[in-house]
A protein has these predicted regions:
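Short, intrinsically disordered N-terminal pre-domain segments
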Residues: 1-32, 475-476
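Acidic glycine-/aspartate-rich tracts in secreted/extracellular proteins
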Residues: 44-47, 136-138, 172-173, 350-351, ...
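C-terminal, surface-exposed recognition/capping segments
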Residues: 241-243, 265-299, 323, 339-352, ...
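A short, polar/charged loop-to-alpha-helix boundary motif
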Residues: 353-368
Length: 476
Protein backbone atom coordinates (compact mmCIF):
# COMPACT_ATOMS: atom_id res chain seq x y z
CA UNK A 1 0.00 0.00 0.00
CA UNK A 2 1.43 3.35 -1.00
CA UNK A 3 2.03 5.94 1.72
CA UNK A 4 0.55 9.39 1.51
CA UNK A 5 2.82 12.41 1.40
CA UNK A 6 2.09 13.19 5.09
CA UNK A 7 2.83 9.61 6.09
CA UNK A 8 6.10 9.64 4.16
CA UNK A 9 7.12 12.84 5.96
CA UNK A 10 6.39 11.28 9.35
CA UNK A 11 8.48 8.22 8.47
CA UNK A 12 11.35 10.50 7.44
CA UNK A 13 11.09 12.35 10.79
CA UNK A 14 11.19 9.06 12.69
CA UNK A 15 14.26 7.89 10.75
CA UNK A 16 15.95 11.27 11.25
CA UNK A 17 15.23 11.25 14.99
CA UNK A 18 16.63 7.72 15.30
CA UNK A 19 19.74 8.64 13.28
CA UNK A 20 20.39 11.78 15.36
CA UNK A 21 19.66 10.12 18.69
CA UNK A 22 22.35 9.97 21.38
CA UNK A 23 23.28 7.32 23.86
CA UNK A 24 22.91 8.29 27.53
CA UNK A 25 26.70 8.34 27.87
CA UNK A 26 26.90 10.92 25.08
CA UNK A 27 24.55 13.45 26.71
CA UNK A 28 26.07 16.55 28.37
CA UNK A 29 26.06 16.86 32.15
CA UNK A 30 23.51 19.12 33.85
CA UNK A 31 24.83 22.53 34.83
CA UNK A 32 23.69 22.37 38.47
CA UNK A 33 23.37 19.88 41.30
CA UNK A 34 20.00 20.92 42.70
CA UNK A 35 17.49 18.09 42.06
CA UNK A 36 14.64 20.52 42.63
CA UNK A 37 15.55 22.29 39.38
CA UNK A 38 15.51 19.15 37.20
CA UNK A 39 12.69 17.50 35.26
CA UNK A 40 12.41 13.94 33.99
CA UNK A 41 10.02 12.03 31.72
CA UNK A 42 7.66 9.53 33.33
CA UNK A 43 4.98 7.19 32.00
CA UNK A 44 1.56 7.61 33.59
CA UNK A 45 -1.71 6.09 32.32
CA UNK A 46 0.01 5.14 29.10
CA UNK A 47 1.19 8.72 28.45
CA UNK A 48 4.57 10.39 28.76
CA UNK A 49 4.52 13.21 31.31
CA UNK A 50 7.09 15.42 33.02
CA UNK A 51 7.85 15.38 36.73
CA UNK A 52 10.24 17.18 39.05
CA UNK A 53 13.11 14.83 39.73
CA UNK A 54 13.01 15.68 43.44
CA UNK A 55 9.52 14.23 43.74
CA UNK A 56 10.88 10.91 42.45
CA UNK A 57 13.72 10.65 44.96
CA UNK A 58 13.75 9.73 48.66
CA UNK A 59 15.25 13.19 49.27
CA UNK A 60 14.87 13.82 53.01
CA UNK A 61 14.57 17.24 54.60
CA UNK A 62 16.86 16.10 57.39
CA UNK A 63 19.71 15.70 54.90
CA UNK A 64 19.79 19.27 53.62
CA UNK A 65 18.38 21.38 56.46
CA UNK A 66 19.74 22.75 59.70
CA UNK A 67 18.03 24.89 62.29
CA UNK A 68 16.72 25.10 65.83
CA UNK A 69 13.63 24.40 67.86
CA UNK A 70 12.40 25.65 71.21
CA UNK A 71 9.55 24.93 73.56
CA UNK A 72 8.03 28.32 74.27
CA UNK A 73 6.81 27.12 77.67
CA UNK A 74 10.41 26.52 78.79
CA UNK A 75 12.30 29.52 80.18
CA UNK A 76 15.77 28.46 79.01
CA UNK A 77 17.44 30.82 76.56
CA UNK A 78 19.19 27.83 74.99
CA UNK A 79 17.57 26.15 71.99
CA UNK A 80 17.97 22.71 70.43
CA UNK A 81 19.80 22.17 67.16
CA UNK A 82 17.86 20.14 64.58
CA UNK A 83 18.53 18.80 61.10
CA UNK A 84 21.82 17.69 59.62
CA UNK A 85 24.47 17.97 62.33
CA UNK A 86 27.22 18.31 59.73
CA UNK A 87 25.56 21.47 58.44
CA UNK A 88 25.64 22.95 61.95
CA UNK A 89 29.41 22.65 61.69
CA UNK A 90 29.87 23.83 58.10
CA UNK A 91 27.13 26.53 58.30
CA UNK A 92 26.61 26.82 54.51
CA UNK A 93 23.87 29.46 54.74
CA UNK A 94 25.85 31.57 57.20
CA UNK A 95 29.03 31.33 55.16
CA UNK A 96 27.31 33.17 52.32
CA UNK A 97 27.68 36.32 54.41
CA UNK A 98 30.65 38.32 53.14
CA UNK A 99 31.84 41.89 53.06
CA UNK A 100 31.92 43.81 49.81
CA UNK A 101 31.92 47.23 48.19
CA UNK A 102 28.65 48.01 46.43
CA UNK A 103 28.17 50.76 43.84
CA UNK A 104 25.01 52.85 43.61
CA UNK A 105 23.58 50.57 40.92
CA UNK A 106 23.84 47.64 43.32
CA UNK A 107 26.81 46.01 41.61
CA UNK A 108 29.54 44.40 43.69
CA UNK A 109 32.78 46.29 43.00
CA UNK A 110 34.86 43.82 44.98
CA UNK A 111 34.59 41.33 47.82
CA UNK A 112 36.70 42.18 50.84
CA UNK A 113 39.46 40.08 52.36
CA UNK A 114 37.55 37.69 54.62
CA UNK A 115 40.26 37.86 57.29
CA UNK A 116 40.91 41.63 57.44
CA UNK A 117 39.23 44.54 55.65
CA UNK A 118 41.68 47.24 56.68
CA UNK A 119 43.71 46.96 53.47
CA UNK A 120 40.73 48.00 51.33
CA UNK A 121 39.56 51.48 50.38
CA UNK A 122 36.44 52.00 52.50
CA UNK A 123 36.00 55.78 52.27
CA UNK A 124 33.07 55.69 49.83
CA UNK A 125 35.08 56.49 46.71
CA UNK A 126 34.77 52.89 45.46
CA UNK A 127 31.36 52.05 46.89
CA UNK A 128 29.48 51.41 50.11
CA UNK A 129 30.89 48.91 52.61
CA UNK A 130 28.19 46.25 52.87
CA UNK A 131 27.67 42.66 53.98
CA UNK A 132 26.04 40.39 51.40
CA UNK A 133 23.74 37.59 52.56
CA UNK A 134 20.65 35.67 51.47
CA UNK A 135 20.01 33.43 48.45
CA UNK A 136 18.80 30.54 50.59
CA UNK A 137 15.55 29.05 51.84
CA UNK A 138 13.94 29.10 55.26
CA UNK A 139 10.90 27.84 57.06
CA UNK A 140 9.26 28.88 60.32
CA UNK A 141 6.82 26.38 61.78
CA UNK A 142 4.89 25.82 64.98
CA UNK A 143 3.66 22.52 66.37
CA UNK A 144 1.77 22.93 69.66
CA UNK A 145 4.32 24.72 71.90
CA UNK A 146 7.31 23.97 69.68
CA UNK A 147 8.65 26.69 67.38
CA UNK A 148 11.17 25.74 64.69
CA UNK A 149 13.48 27.71 62.42
CA UNK A 150 14.96 25.87 59.44
CA UNK A 151 17.55 26.90 56.84
CA UNK A 152 18.51 25.17 53.59
CA UNK A 153 20.28 25.88 50.33
CA UNK A 154 17.52 23.91 48.58
CA UNK A 155 13.88 24.86 47.87
CA UNK A 156 12.35 22.21 50.07
CA UNK A 157 8.54 21.94 50.16
CA UNK A 158 7.08 24.59 52.46
CA UNK A 159 10.25 26.70 52.48
CA UNK A 160 10.32 30.28 51.25
CA UNK A 161 13.14 31.96 49.37
CA UNK A 162 15.28 34.58 51.09
CA UNK A 163 16.60 36.77 48.27
CA UNK A 164 20.10 38.17 48.09
CA UNK A 165 20.36 41.42 50.04
CA UNK A 166 22.95 43.75 51.50
CA UNK A 167 23.21 45.44 54.90
CA UNK A 168 25.74 48.08 55.87
CA UNK A 169 28.75 46.81 57.74
CA UNK A 170 28.54 49.92 59.91
CA UNK A 171 25.89 52.07 61.52
CA UNK A 172 25.14 54.54 58.75
CA UNK A 173 26.37 58.09 58.39
CA UNK A 174 25.31 60.76 55.87
CA UNK A 175 27.33 62.34 53.10
CA UNK A 176 26.49 65.93 53.97
CA UNK A 177 27.06 67.40 50.49
CA UNK A 178 24.54 65.04 48.88
CA UNK A 179 22.33 63.88 51.78
CA UNK A 180 23.08 60.27 50.87
CA UNK A 181 22.97 57.62 53.58
CA UNK A 182 26.38 55.97 53.62
CA UNK A 183 28.34 53.05 55.02
CA UNK A 184 31.96 54.18 55.00
CA UNK A 185 35.12 54.63 57.01
CA UNK A 186 35.70 58.32 56.42
CA UNK A 187 36.70 61.02 58.90
CA UNK A 188 36.29 64.02 56.58
CA UNK A 189 33.73 66.75 57.25
CA UNK A 190 31.59 65.56 54.35
CA UNK A 191 30.76 62.38 56.27
CA UNK A 192 30.50 63.94 59.72
CA UNK A 193 28.17 61.90 61.91
CA UNK A 194 26.00 62.81 64.87
CA UNK A 195 24.03 65.97 64.10
CA UNK A 196 26.90 67.37 62.00
CA UNK A 197 28.51 69.31 64.87
CA UNK A 198 31.48 70.99 63.17
CA UNK A 199 32.57 72.71 66.38
CA UNK A 200 33.34 69.29 67.91
CA UNK A 201 35.86 68.27 65.24
CA UNK A 202 38.96 68.86 67.36
CA UNK A 203 37.47 67.57 70.61
CA UNK A 204 37.42 64.08 72.09
CA UNK A 205 33.67 63.99 71.49
CA UNK A 206 34.16 64.50 67.75
CA UNK A 207 31.55 62.93 65.49
CA UNK A 208 33.92 62.73 62.52
CA UNK A 209 33.85 59.13 61.32
CA UNK A 210 30.89 58.29 63.57
CA UNK A 211 27.33 57.28 62.63
CA UNK A 212 24.74 59.95 61.90
CA UNK A 213 21.86 60.43 64.35
CA UNK A 214 19.17 62.99 65.21
CA UNK A 215 17.36 61.89 62.02
CA UNK A 216 13.79 60.62 61.67
CA UNK A 217 12.94 57.31 60.04
CA UNK A 218 11.27 59.32 57.29
CA UNK A 219 14.50 61.14 56.49
CA UNK A 220 16.66 58.03 56.87
CA UNK A 221 14.53 56.47 54.12
CA UNK A 222 14.87 59.59 51.96
CA UNK A 223 18.64 59.76 52.42
CA UNK A 224 18.99 56.06 51.52
CA UNK A 225 16.89 56.53 48.36
CA UNK A 226 19.13 59.47 47.41
CA UNK A 227 21.79 56.91 46.49
CA UNK A 228 19.90 56.26 43.24
CA UNK A 229 17.13 58.54 42.04
CA UNK A 230 13.86 56.83 41.16
CA UNK A 231 14.81 53.55 42.83
CA UNK A 232 13.45 52.00 46.02
CA UNK A 233 16.23 49.41 46.29
CA UNK A 234 18.34 51.52 48.66
CA UNK A 235 16.81 51.71 52.12
CA UNK A 236 17.60 52.37 55.73
CA UNK A 237 17.56 49.33 58.01
CA UNK A 238 14.59 47.09 57.21
CA UNK A 239 12.61 44.80 59.46
CA UNK A 240 13.16 41.84 57.13
CA UNK A 241 16.93 42.27 57.40
CA UNK A 242 16.81 42.71 61.19
CA UNK A 243 14.63 39.65 61.58
CA UNK A 244 16.80 37.43 59.40
CA UNK A 245 20.02 38.53 61.11
CA UNK A 246 18.48 37.60 64.44
CA UNK A 247 17.57 34.09 63.31
CA UNK A 248 20.93 33.59 61.63
CA UNK A 249 22.56 34.33 64.97
CA UNK A 250 20.19 32.06 66.91
CA UNK A 251 20.70 29.11 64.57
CA UNK A 252 24.48 29.55 64.63
CA UNK A 253 24.90 29.88 68.40
CA UNK A 254 21.82 27.96 69.62
CA UNK A 255 20.85 30.68 72.09
CA UNK A 256 18.21 33.41 72.12
CA UNK A 257 20.58 35.68 74.06
CA UNK A 258 22.82 37.65 71.71
CA UNK A 259 24.67 39.04 74.76
CA UNK A 260 26.03 35.69 75.92
CA UNK A 261 29.76 36.02 76.59
CA UNK A 262 31.83 35.76 73.43
CA UNK A 263 33.62 32.41 73.17
CA UNK A 264 36.10 31.51 70.44
CA UNK A 265 36.06 27.81 71.35
CA UNK A 266 33.78 25.30 69.67
CA UNK A 267 31.76 22.77 71.63
CA UNK A 268 32.95 19.17 71.84
CA UNK A 269 30.64 18.45 68.88
CA UNK A 270 32.21 21.23 66.80
CA UNK A 271 29.41 23.80 67.15
CA UNK A 272 29.58 27.52 67.90
CA UNK A 273 28.80 28.52 71.48
CA UNK A 274 28.39 31.68 73.52
CA UNK A 275 27.24 34.90 71.91
CA UNK A 276 28.42 38.37 70.92
CA UNK A 277 29.17 39.68 74.40
CA UNK A 278 27.71 42.74 76.12
CA UNK A 279 28.40 45.00 73.17
CA UNK A 280 28.55 48.75 73.69
CA UNK A 281 25.84 48.79 76.37
CA UNK A 282 27.57 49.48 79.69
CA UNK A 283 27.94 53.27 79.84
CA UNK A 284 26.60 55.39 82.68
CA UNK A 285 23.70 57.56 81.52
CA UNK A 286 24.75 60.70 83.38
CA UNK A 287 28.36 60.48 82.25
CA UNK A 288 27.41 59.86 78.62
CA UNK A 289 25.05 62.82 78.69
CA UNK A 290 27.70 65.08 80.19
CA UNK A 291 30.33 63.85 77.72
CA UNK A 292 28.45 64.37 74.44
CA UNK A 293 24.70 64.45 75.05
CA UNK A 294 24.05 60.80 74.06
CA UNK A 295 25.59 61.11 70.60
CA UNK A 296 27.55 58.19 69.05
CA UNK A 297 31.21 57.78 69.90
CA UNK A 298 32.44 54.50 68.34
CA UNK A 299 34.21 55.14 64.98
CA UNK A 300 32.77 53.31 61.99
CA UNK A 301 35.06 50.45 60.97
CA UNK A 302 36.67 50.13 64.39
CA UNK A 303 36.52 46.30 64.20
CA UNK A 304 37.40 45.91 60.52
CA UNK A 305 40.53 43.93 61.32
CA UNK A 306 38.13 41.04 62.06
CA UNK A 307 37.04 40.91 58.41
CA UNK A 308 34.03 38.69 57.78
CA UNK A 309 34.46 37.21 61.23
CA UNK A 310 32.66 37.46 64.54
CA UNK A 311 34.29 38.86 67.65
CA UNK A 312 34.76 41.87 69.88
CA UNK A 313 37.37 44.60 70.27
CA UNK A 314 38.01 46.76 73.32
CA UNK A 315 37.47 50.51 73.03
CA UNK A 316 38.68 52.97 75.66
CA UNK A 317 36.41 55.93 76.33
CA UNK A 318 38.03 59.38 76.42
CA UNK A 319 38.94 60.67 79.86
CA UNK A 320 36.39 63.44 79.34
CA UNK A 321 33.78 60.71 79.79
CA UNK A 322 35.46 59.25 82.87
CA UNK A 323 38.93 59.80 84.27
CA UNK A 324 39.18 56.08 84.96
CA UNK A 325 39.35 55.33 81.20
CA UNK A 326 36.16 53.29 80.97
CA UNK A 327 36.39 50.40 78.49
CA UNK A 328 33.65 48.86 76.36
CA UNK A 329 33.65 45.94 73.94
CA UNK A 330 32.61 46.65 70.34
CA UNK A 331 31.02 43.50 68.95
CA UNK A 332 30.88 42.28 65.38
CA UNK A 333 28.74 39.57 63.81
CA UNK A 334 30.05 38.17 60.51
CA UNK A 335 31.25 41.57 59.34
CA UNK A 336 28.39 43.59 60.84
CA UNK A 337 29.69 46.04 63.43
CA UNK A 338 27.55 46.99 66.44
CA UNK A 339 24.54 44.86 65.43
CA UNK A 340 23.00 46.01 68.74
CA UNK A 341 23.88 48.55 71.40
CA UNK A 342 25.77 51.84 70.96
CA UNK A 343 22.78 53.58 69.31
CA UNK A 344 19.21 52.52 68.53
CA UNK A 345 18.37 51.60 64.93
CA UNK A 346 15.35 52.95 63.10
CA UNK A 347 13.82 50.08 61.10
CA UNK A 348 11.61 50.39 58.01
CA UNK A 349 8.94 48.05 56.67
CA UNK A 350 7.12 47.77 59.99
CA UNK A 351 4.38 49.99 61.46
CA UNK A 352 2.46 49.42 64.68
CA UNK A 353 -1.07 50.74 65.17
CA UNK A 354 -1.40 51.27 68.91
CA UNK A 355 -4.92 51.77 70.15
CA UNK A 356 -5.71 53.51 73.44
CA UNK A 357 -7.39 51.97 76.46
CA UNK A 358 -6.77 48.95 78.61
CA UNK A 359 -8.60 46.69 76.17
CA UNK A 360 -6.98 48.06 73.03
CA UNK A 361 -4.60 46.27 70.69
CA UNK A 362 -1.14 47.09 69.38
CA UNK A 363 -1.43 45.74 65.84
CA UNK A 364 1.78 44.93 63.98
CA UNK A 365 1.88 45.48 60.22
CA UNK A 366 4.86 44.50 58.06
CA UNK A 367 5.83 44.99 54.43
CA UNK A 368 8.55 43.38 52.30
CA UNK A 369 8.06 45.67 49.29
CA UNK A 370 10.19 48.82 49.76
CA UNK A 371 8.11 50.72 47.19
CA UNK A 372 5.23 50.59 49.70
CA UNK A 373 7.17 51.70 52.78
CA UNK A 374 5.50 54.71 54.39
CA UNK A 375 5.02 56.47 57.71
CA UNK A 376 1.36 57.45 57.48
CA UNK A 377 -0.74 54.30 56.92
CA UNK A 378 -0.75 50.53 56.50
CA UNK A 379 -1.50 50.27 52.79
CA UNK A 380 0.41 47.36 51.26
CA UNK A 381 1.28 46.03 54.72
CA UNK A 382 0.14 42.74 56.28
CA UNK A 383 -1.12 42.33 59.82
CA UNK A 384 1.03 39.59 61.39
CA UNK A 385 -0.05 39.73 65.01
CA UNK A 386 -0.29 41.94 68.06
CA UNK A 387 2.52 43.45 70.11
CA UNK A 388 2.70 43.19 73.88
CA UNK A 389 1.02 46.15 75.58
CA UNK A 390 3.38 46.23 78.56
CA UNK A 391 7.09 46.86 78.93
CA UNK A 392 9.39 44.17 80.24
CA UNK A 393 11.74 41.36 79.28
CA UNK A 394 10.41 39.40 76.32
CA UNK A 395 8.81 36.04 77.07
CA UNK A 396 7.09 35.32 73.75
CA UNK A 397 7.31 36.74 70.25
CA UNK A 398 4.67 36.76 67.51
CA UNK A 399 6.72 34.24 65.44
CA UNK A 400 3.99 32.93 63.09
CA UNK A 401 4.82 31.71 59.58
CA UNK A 402 7.55 34.29 58.97
CA UNK A 403 9.48 34.27 62.24
CA UNK A 404 8.27 37.65 63.51
CA UNK A 405 10.48 38.89 66.36
CA UNK A 406 8.13 41.53 67.76
CA UNK A 407 7.35 40.80 71.44
CA UNK A 408 3.90 39.34 72.05
CA UNK A 409 4.23 38.76 75.79
CA UNK A 410 6.58 40.04 78.48
CA UNK A 411 7.53 38.31 81.71
CA UNK A 412 10.94 36.94 80.87
CA UNK A 413 14.29 37.96 82.31
CA UNK A 414 17.79 39.05 81.35
CA UNK A 415 18.91 35.39 81.23
CA UNK A 416 15.62 33.62 80.49
CA UNK A 417 13.44 33.32 77.41
CA UNK A 418 14.56 35.97 74.86
CA UNK A 419 16.74 37.92 77.33
CA UNK A 420 15.99 41.30 75.66
CA UNK A 421 13.70 44.12 76.73
CA UNK A 422 10.50 45.45 75.17
CA UNK A 423 9.70 49.17 75.32
CA UNK A 424 6.31 50.66 74.47
CA UNK A 425 3.63 53.00 75.76
CA UNK A 426 -0.09 53.41 75.23
CA UNK A 427 -1.23 56.71 73.67
CA UNK A 428 -4.37 58.68 74.50
CA UNK A 429 -5.57 58.24 70.91
CA UNK A 430 -4.78 55.74 68.16
CA UNK A 431 -1.20 56.23 66.90
CA UNK A 432 1.10 54.88 64.20
CA UNK A 433 4.46 53.97 65.70
CA UNK A 434 7.73 52.94 64.15
CA UNK A 435 10.03 50.33 65.69
CA UNK A 436 13.59 50.78 66.94
CA UNK A 437 15.84 47.76 67.49
CA UNK A 438 18.97 46.91 69.43
CA UNK A 439 19.04 49.25 72.40
CA UNK A 440 21.81 51.76 73.11
CA UNK A 441 24.92 52.31 75.17
CA UNK A 442 23.25 52.54 78.60
CA UNK A 443 20.79 49.64 78.25
CA UNK A 444 23.04 46.91 79.63
CA UNK A 445 21.33 43.51 79.68
CA UNK A 446 18.14 45.02 78.23
CA UNK A 447 19.84 45.47 74.85
CA UNK A 448 20.31 42.86 72.15
CA UNK A 449 19.27 41.77 68.69
CA UNK A 450 15.66 41.26 69.82
CA UNK A 451 15.40 44.42 71.93
CA UNK A 452 12.55 46.47 70.42
CA UNK A 453 10.87 49.79 71.11
CA UNK A 454 7.56 51.09 69.72
CA UNK A 455 7.44 54.25 71.83
CA UNK A 456 7.92 56.77 69.03
CA UNK A 457 6.36 57.97 65.80
CA UNK A 458 8.54 57.65 62.65
CA UNK A 459 9.07 61.42 62.74
CA UNK A 460 10.90 61.26 66.07
CA UNK A 461 14.59 62.17 66.29
CA UNK A 462 17.14 61.91 69.09
CA UNK A 463 20.90 61.99 69.60
CA UNK A 464 20.99 58.24 70.19
CA UNK A 465 18.79 57.13 67.26
CA UNK A 466 20.49 56.03 64.04
CA UNK A 467 19.98 53.40 61.37
CA UNK A 468 21.82 51.26 58.84
CA UNK A 469 21.96 51.24 55.04
CA UNK A 470 20.41 48.37 53.07
CA UNK A 471 20.21 47.42 49.42
CA UNK A 472 17.33 45.11 48.47
CA UNK A 473 17.67 43.97 44.82
CA UNK A 474 14.26 42.27 44.76
CA UNK A 475 11.29 42.09 47.09
CA UNK A 476 11.12 39.07 49.39
Amino acid sequence: MALSTDEENKVREIIEAFTNGKRLSDLPNVSGNNPFNLLCEVLEDGESKKAALATMLPYMEEQCMYGIERDKTVSSRLVTRIGNTALHKSLPVHNRMRGCLLDDDGNVVEYLNPRDWTGHVRDGSRGQVMVEFGDFYCRFETSANIERVKFSLFPLPGYRYVPLMYVSAYEATVQRSTNKLSSVVNTTADYRGGANQADWDTLSKTVLGRPATQISRTNFRTYARNRKAGSTKWNCMTYDVQKMLYWLFVVEYATLNSQEAFNTQLTAEGYRQGGLGDGVTTLDSGKWNTFNGYYPFIPCGYTDELGNGTGEKEYTMPTEYDASSKKVKVCRYRGIENPFGHIWQWTDGINVRINPGSNGLSEVFVCSDPSKFNDSNYNGYSHVGNEARAEGYVKEIIFGESGEIIPALVGGGSTTYFCDYHYTNIPASVALRGVLFGGYAINGASAGLACASSTNAPSYTAASLGSRLCFIPTSA
